[in-house]
């Protein structure tokens, strides 16, 4: 299938708020506290790729403490989708990349079993140096995960598990995201292949050129956990220099709002560059099928 003019979020009512959906080649940040429904929204977006582009999106989990984000349980319950996980230590020979059965996977947990805190301030200089060596190895695996899916038709990705810190610049998760976004997701396919294959690039050059994809036709959704629980607090949150919110084309805020004597969930499209979008605060609920937007 051809890449659409807009990527559906998997929620028709939200697509309508966004003037038709998300813009290809851009970053969407979905921000809200733990448990508000970000992972479900991310899965709905990823699943929508099956109908729209012919391939579901992929999930890149950056949670560094405890288990992942329960993507497998959610995907099975919401869509009867059994996620195929790529393991962090799974070997990958150059010839494997072109084998769809070998490379096409749905989920990758980069910091699985690491148990690390997300702030660089928590690490001594020698610990940070040691951790960067380990990160480099994990990033090599990450290149294989993304490239190995993109050459087989995937056009959307969801990055989840980003934990809150006082300053985004102190978070090693944001260092990793910055690398992935600029050196994998927004880089010409043949140059990503060079980073992956290195000395084996020439031997694979013909296959690389026959599997080119346009990185401007990829859509990325970053699910960003906030300290703030209330939607009003998120609306007032300052954006610091280097914050991924400043670089995003689209920002969707999800939080709690007071409705009389009870709290309910609501979302707001705070930014949607280059497109008309609604200014409304829209209540929603989470069902077995995911997010459902409600009448105000």
Predicted stretch roles:
Residues 189, 193-290:
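Phosphate-binding/switch region of NTP-binding enzymes
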């Amino acid at each position: 299938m051809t890449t659409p003019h807009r990527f559906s979020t998997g929620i028709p009512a939200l697509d309508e708020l966004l003037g038709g959906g998300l813009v290809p080649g851009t970053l969407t940040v979905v921000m809200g506290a733990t448990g508000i429904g970000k992972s479900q929204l991310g899965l709905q977006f990823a699943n929508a790729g099956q109908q729209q582009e012919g391939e579901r999106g992929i999930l890149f989990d950056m949670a560094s403490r405890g288990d992942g984000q329960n993507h497998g349980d959610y995907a099975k319950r919401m869509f009867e989708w059994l996620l195929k996980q790529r393991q962090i230590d799974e070997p990958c020979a150059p010839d494997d990349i072109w084998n769809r059965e070998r490379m096409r996977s749905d989920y990758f947990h980069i910091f699985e079993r690491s148990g690390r805190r997300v702030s660089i301030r928590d690490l001594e200089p020698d610990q940070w140096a040691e951790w960067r060596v380990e990160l480099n190895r994990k990033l090599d695996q990450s290149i294989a995960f993304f490239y190995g899916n993109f050459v087989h038709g995937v056009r959307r990705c969801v990055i989840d598990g980003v934990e809150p810190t006082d300053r985004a610049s102190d978070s090693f998760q944001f260092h990793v995201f910055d690398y992935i976004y600029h050196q994998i997701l927004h880089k010409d396919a043949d140059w990503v292949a060079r980073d992956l294959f290195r000395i084996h690039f020439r031997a694979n050059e013909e296959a690389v050129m026959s599997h080119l994809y346009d990185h401007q036709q990829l859509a990325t959704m970053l699910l960003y956990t906030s300290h703030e629980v209330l939607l009003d607090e998120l609306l007032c949150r300052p954006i610091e220099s280097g914050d991924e919110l400043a670089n995003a084309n689209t920002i969707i805020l999800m939080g709690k709002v007071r409705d009389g004597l009870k709290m309910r969930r609501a979302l707001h499209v705070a930014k949607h560059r280059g497109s008309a979008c609604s200014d409304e605060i829209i209540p929603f609920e989470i069902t077995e099928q995911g997010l459902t937007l409600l009448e105000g």
